[in-house]
């Protein structure tokens, strides 16, 4: 019996071989990774987080540049920290700006870093900031982080008023630029 009480999963040699082939051929993307920097996760068995991701077969991870009530300065600081990581270990990482970059990360056995926001508060009412952050590599964004902001209601708001005028404008701009609208919460 396993620790979770559900029993042990046993595969036949054929099933094991098939699952390894499928895993190796698939694109593996973590839609919301833990922190890669600020702080960097501690080594496990002497291996850095990036190395563990590569060994596990990940091809890309979505790293958060802004969450909760983060502002413009917070988001820029996180972008700077992740650019430093990309510069420090270019043999292990690549900034993801397109689908082709994800395929390249897989082909080169690197971890693709996808910049994401869990709130659009760093954008504020400045529509031009979408273009600026897109040029910095932003490719995925939740408009709200659970609570209401100028873009709309988050999942914790009982009224559920949906998107505001700014929110609708943001979705149009994100669609124009190719930034994924994340609906997680």
Task: Enumerate the predicted regions with their spans.
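N-terminal hydrophobic targeting/anchoring segments and the immediately downstream early-domain regions
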Residues: 1-162
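Catalytic beta/alpha-barrel core
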Residues: 94-96, 179-185
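Glycine-rich tight-turn/loop motif centered on a GG-T
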Residues: 153-172, 176-180
């Amino acid at each position: 019996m396993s620790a979770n009480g559900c029993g042990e999963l046993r595969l036949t040699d054929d099933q094991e071989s098939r699952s390894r082939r499928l895993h190796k051929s698939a694109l593996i993307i973590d839609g919301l990774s833990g922190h890669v920097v600020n702080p960097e996760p501690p080594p496990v068995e002497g291996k850095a987080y990036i190395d563990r991701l590569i060994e596990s077969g990940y091809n890309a991870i979505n790293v958060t540049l802004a969450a909760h009530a983060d502002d413009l300065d917070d988001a820029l600081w996180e972008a700077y920290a992740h650019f430093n990581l990309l510069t420090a270990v270019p043999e292990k990482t690549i900034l993801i700006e397109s689908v082709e970059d994800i395929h390249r990360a897989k082909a080169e056995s690197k971890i693709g870093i996808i910049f994401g926001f869990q709130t659009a508060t760093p954008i504020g009412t400045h529509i031009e900031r979408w273009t600026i952050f897109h040029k910095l590599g932003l490719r995925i964004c939740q408009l709200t982080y659970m609570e209401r902001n100028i873009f709309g209601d988050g999942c914790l708001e009982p009224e559920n008023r949906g998107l505001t005028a700014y929110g609708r404008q943001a979705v149009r701009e994100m669609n124009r630029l190719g930034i994924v609208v994340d609906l997680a919460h």
